[in-house]
Amino acid sequence: MSILFQAYPLARPALFAMDAETAHEVTLAGLQRAYDCGATRRLLRTRPQAPATLMGLALDNPVGLAAGLDKNGAYIDALGNLGFGFVEVGTVTPRAQPGNPKPRMFRLPRAQALINRLGFNNQGLDAFIANVQRSQWRAQGGVLGLNIGKNADTPIERAADDYLLGLEGVYPHADYVTVNISSPNTQNLRALQGGDELSALLAQLRDKRAELADRHQRHVPLAVKIAPDLSEAQIDAIADILPRYGVDGVIATNTTLSRDAVAGQPHANEAGGLSGAPVHALSLAVIARLRQRMGPGAAIIGVGGILSGRQAREKIDAGANAVQLYTGLIYRGPALVGECASAIKAAGK
């Protein structure tokens, strides 16, 4: 086992003594230093092997990094070397924005959960693309997803303008693009999951992607990331709409607004999206409903509350083709990646 993997449980108490967002930044900086000095390079050669196909893309294993951990695409290579079969970075907006006031990230250790109200803080599309272009991840055979969103000050009626700018900017540099319409931290964003609003947005993205595919002579798959706080009727409507506009995959799910599982715990009443263990069951229900409605051919990425290999396998059993990790990495460290890949492989999925 890598020294890096062994070190994380020892470092975690010190990290958890810090403000959650500060610890996040310190961890990424430390990971980058370890990568730069070669401490994690050999992990790329020993990436867990559990070959899978997702949206037509060949993966070494079906365990990915969820968007949000590396919003600016500044740590792609260092993160990829932890053993992921694919890496997704962002969410990026056309223009730089600071996000919501700090503090805006809170741990709930008893629930193995996190609440964030970051609000798409990022350096903007130009800086994001420059970072992606510097990365060697794709050249080394890694699969890269780029996640796009809208600026906070863009009226919801003009949201499509931001997504079209984002798609055009990231298209040449992505193996797939994710349309994030489910963050609870951008006002009214989740309204885009509604039937009419979603259809209008996807119609424009479909046409723009066709134009970009012709220009760049390559087809880039498109995924849509949805919330866990949807009724069965809403899930069914989304499941029916996505194929109509040529969407290749769905990511289920983003964070939840529900606090039922953490009521009474410190920070439970903080505004923002709840991630981690309490989201697992919510995500499973959405995945199962999507699979039932969309049939066996749909590409579904399961994310939310994976803190063990068993939970990764449960996502696959519910109907996901692949999984993504974020909060689980904070509580378990990078060893979780290989554990999840091994569990999925052992189950023969």
Swiss-Prot record:
It comes from Bordetella petrii (strain ATCC BAA-461 / DSM 12804 / CCUG 43448). GO terms for molecular function: dihydroorotate dehydrogenase (quinone) activity. Substrate binds at K71, N116, R117, L118, G119, F120, N180, N185, N254, T255. PROSITE patterns: DHODEHASE_1, DHODEHASE_2. It is a peripheral membrane protein. This is Dihydroorotate dehydrogenase (quinone). It comes from the Bacteria. It is found in: Cell membrane. Binds 1 FMN per subunit. The gene is pyrD. Its cofactor is FMN.
